[in-house]
Each structure stands twice: as C-alpha cells, then as structure tokens.
Amino acid sequence: MALLQISEPGQVSAIHQHKLAIGIDLGTTNSLVASVMSGQSKVLIHENNETILPSVVHCGKDNKLTVGCNAYHYAKTDPTNTIISVKRFMGMSYKEVSTFKNCPYQLLENGNNVLFHTATGDLSAVEISASILASLKQCAEKSLGGALFGAVITVPAYFNDAQRQATKDAATLAGLKTLRLLNEPTAAAVAYGLESGEEGVHAIYDLGGGTFDISILSFSKGVFKVLAISGDSTLGGDDFDALIVDDCIKQLGINKLTPTQMQKIKQFSRTAKETLSNHEFAKFNCIEKSYRITKKKFEILAKVLIKRTLLLTKRAIRDAQVDVEDIKDIIMVGGSTRMPLVRFMVSDLFNKPVLCSINPDEVVAKGAAIQANILAGNKSQGDVLLLDVLPLSLGLETMGGLVEKVIHRNTTIPIIRAQEFTTFKDGQTAMSVHVLQGERELVKDCRSLAKFDLQGIPPMVAGSARIQIEFQVDTDGLLSVSAVEQISGVKTNITIKPSYGLTDVQMEKMLKDSILFAKTDIQTRQLHETQVEANRTIQAIDLALKKDKHMLDVKMLNNILTARTILFNMAHSDDEKAIKTALENLENTCSKFVEMRMNNTVMKAMQGHNVDEF
C-alpha cells in the first residue's frame, strides 16, 4: 500500500520540493557538470563562459590549488607542479604509474599509494581529483542558486574496485554526496534517450582523453541492461598525442628534453592532432626546429591504437552473445571520437553509420544529470531502470589453493550472492576468508582483494559447521563480504577498500590467460581437488585409528597402515590417476573398519534402550 504524506494546510512538504542534483563527467582531459532544468539536461557554464573545465590542477607555492583554464597556463612554465590527466593515476600503485612514458612529475611511493611531490606539498591523486570536483561543485551551486542534494559521477565502465573507490573518496573530500557512480557508456545511452525508442541492442563506443570503454546494452520492457563491457582505462586521446610526440622527437633527432620542453611538445602535439581532423597536415616549431606531419602519416600511426579498441569491441560483442547485425545503434562518446579515422573504422566494423549528433564531450554529463534528477526524487524512475555489470569474477580461496567463483564476470549489478562452506578439521574454531578477483582456477593466478578471519566457530566434527559467505556488490560496483556461522550465529564482515587496483593491461591479461590456460587450469584444479581429498581421508583415518585401533587385529591394522602410507606418499604428486587409485585402495581396505566403528557407535547408543523406543 502506498504511503501518503500528510502536512498542514498551506505548508509544502519537503518531500515534494525540487532537489538540486547534478551529473558530473570527471574526465581525463576535461570535466563537465550538468543539471536538469525545466525538463532539459543542460551543461552548466563556468565563469569564463565555457562549459568545459580542463582537468588540470596547478599546485602553487602559496598552498593554493588552481583548477581549469587558469591552471593550464602553468603547464608550459611549471610542468612539475601542473598535474594533467590525474584520472590515469586514480587507484594505481607506485609500481604501475612508474611505467608511464614521459611523465614530468616527481612521484613518491607511500605504501601502495602514489603521491605527487609539488610546491603545495605531497598530494595524492584523490586529493587532486577532489579539487577538480570542488570546482565543479562551486560552479553548480552558483548556477543553480543553492546547496546541492547530491551528484551522479561517471566512471569508465572498466574501472575496477580501487578506481571506483578512489573516485568516491575524492567526491567526499570535495564535500559532494555521491548518489551513484554511473558507467560512462550507460550515461551516454540515457542522454540519447534510447529508452524512449524501440527495444533492441545498442553499442556505446567511448574513447576519451585517457580511457576507452565499449558497452553492449539491451533495452527491453523499460529495463536498460548492460550485456557486456570491455575497455582499457589507460588508452585514450593522450596516447594519440604521444604518437605525434614520439614522431616529433624521432624526426628532429632530439636526445633529451627538460620537463618544460616536453610539456610544450605535448601541447603542440594535441593541437596538431585536432588540426589533422580537418586539414591535410599540421606543423609547429619545437626547440628552434620545425616539425611537420601529414594526415596520412598520422592515420597510419593511429590505426594501431584504433585496432586495439576494435579488438576490445569484438570481445564485448562476443561476451554479449549477439551478432554485429543485431546492434541497432552505435553511439560515439568522448572527444577522441571526433577523429575521422575513428568514426570510419568503427562504422566499417558495424557496417552502418555511427551516431554522433550530441556533442561527444557533453553527452556523458547530460546523461548523468538525468539519472541524478531521478535519484534525487525529482522524476519517477518508472521510465527506465539501469542495470550495469561486473567486469571480473569474484570468489574465495578454498583448500588446495583453489578459487571458488561466487559472482561471475558480466553478472548484472547490484547483486547479493551467498555460498555455504564448512570446516576442514575436527574442532576447527576459526576460518580465514580470502577474497579474490579474476578468471583463473588457482589463487596464485588471481588478484587478492582482502583477507579476514571468522572467529568463534563452535568446535565440532570436520564438515559439520555451516558457514555462509555472502558477497554484495552495490550499484557503484563496490564489494562487501560477510561470513556467518549458521549454528552459533557468529558473524563478521568487511567492505573491500583496496589501496590500488588493476591496470586494464592486467585485466586484459587475466581474461586472455583464463581462455589460453582454460584446459590446463581445469586439469590443475582436478589434481588439487584430488590432493585435498587424499589429505582429508588420511586425517580421518589417523583420527579413527587413534580412537579405535584396539578393534583391529594385527593383519587388518598392517593392511590399513600400508594403504595409508601408499596414499601419503602419493598425495603430493602430480599423478592424479595414481592418487585416485591409492585413495580408492585405502577406502576399500578400511571398509570393514568403518563398518565395525559404525556398529560399535550404534550399540553404545542403544545400551539401556529397547528397539521399540527408536
């Protein structure tokens, strides 16, 4: 039954007041903020009359952080203190970012985190991103004329748990309430109003300044469901700029550059790339030398990167279990899709024209604003339901170093899934829970997310305890895990907040390896399972002999001990067939002993009772 809101005559219920909600596209190169006004999603304008805020932060000596266009002016004169493309550093470890080419910043290692050594002080990627978000928040509050209820912030669909958590942390630091983290391709689909069109399958090709995402979505009966996602959070417009940078350095025979010179070449290269979208050549002066590149040469260089995006696109189509012909629309998102070659090659893959009628820089922010307006309660969500998916499988370590998958890759989120486990040894009073991410069968081949212990399990016979472990992934793609011993009610839980995450090169490798080593992994898993069963049987026999050895005559005891020794010697070998043979031999040898113990237990239970009582 619906609840009615009752208020005094003349009073307006707060529940019906319009709440100020915004959508934020926190981009690698540029960031935007949008809001729904008079039923239309509009990108808000900053003080300089621009809708785009460059994702650039200058860290000055006076502890002042300058954001946007004003910060960008410092890039040539003070490159080590001017942080550009900070999104690439979100959720990354020091080891991972140390491989970035031509990085002008002084980076410090702080545990698993990375710090930028600047004139302002040592700052994390989260703190720098927070200053960008704070600037967007200030712009929104000024434009909308009031305090914000909250924001929907977009992230690449292929952002992992660490990168998503880092984004939420940055929002909190900026004083923003995160209503939801929304995948960028999903936001684009909302902006294009696909939910108001015919039912069908759509592809969202999102090539931004530093990230690439491809999402295959279906729309049916009011539900937007992400069928599959793929991408690379370290591939974007910056990499196309780098092609020109490298060609310039090679062509002009430059051996060494100062950080200031490198930053100038990067800016010139970006301008040259944009020029080549409409002209046959571009040129600029570099260290008193003239550099020239033709459109034809740039496209030859760029094809390699575009082909990488198309391989990921094909994989997403395969994962979605649809054919190219089934896809109705291909939406182009991100500033890098302005390159004519990108549009041509994507159109050629799908054999149909691509959609790019909405400004590719603004489409994500507009979609996020529409979703924020719904989540703020300003508009019914009855029109459309958004369902995203998980990029990698989540599971637990079991005996023998095996991984038991709890939630599989490309499962729709939010989701709660539980699985029951038990104890391995008699009298076991604690269990270590090891949460993993990946597609392989063994712990050593997957990524560790967290470990925690469930203490206070009542001591009982091995296999008697019932421990339910529950995985919960929220709408933001963040994971929490709980463990409950069903008999005693003992419970513990953890929210996974990793200090750094996987690069998409690592993600790609994990997925490729899961296919490449699928047969070997299954064989290895079967071997490990047999080894675990052998050790479990040996422990059970040892315990039985300790209690009831007196039941056996010398011959039976010697036969059991001989069979046990054979299995013990084979238990750690790589010969699964031999282990199974030895295991079967021990079980057959012990069958009479098992029967004797069972009869003895029954006789003890019946002492002093009649059969009729049972």
Curated annotation (Swiss-Prot):
Keyword terms, alphabetized: ATP-binding, Chaperone, Nucleotide-binding
SUPFAM superfamilies assigned to the protein according to its UniProt record, in alphabetical order: Actin-like ATPase domain, Heat shock protein 70kD (HSP70), C-terminal subdomain, Heat shock protein 70kD (HSP70), peptide-binding domain
Record-linked Pfam families: HSP70 (PF00012)
CDD domains according to UniProt: ASKHA_NBD_HSP70_HscA
GO terms of biological process kind: iron-sulfur cluster assembly
Membership in a protein family: Belongs to the heat shock protein 70 family.
Function, in words: Chaperone involved in the maturation of iron-sulfur cluster-containing proteins. Has a low intrinsic ATPase activity which is markedly stimulated by HscB.
Protein name in UniProt: Chaperone protein HscA homolog
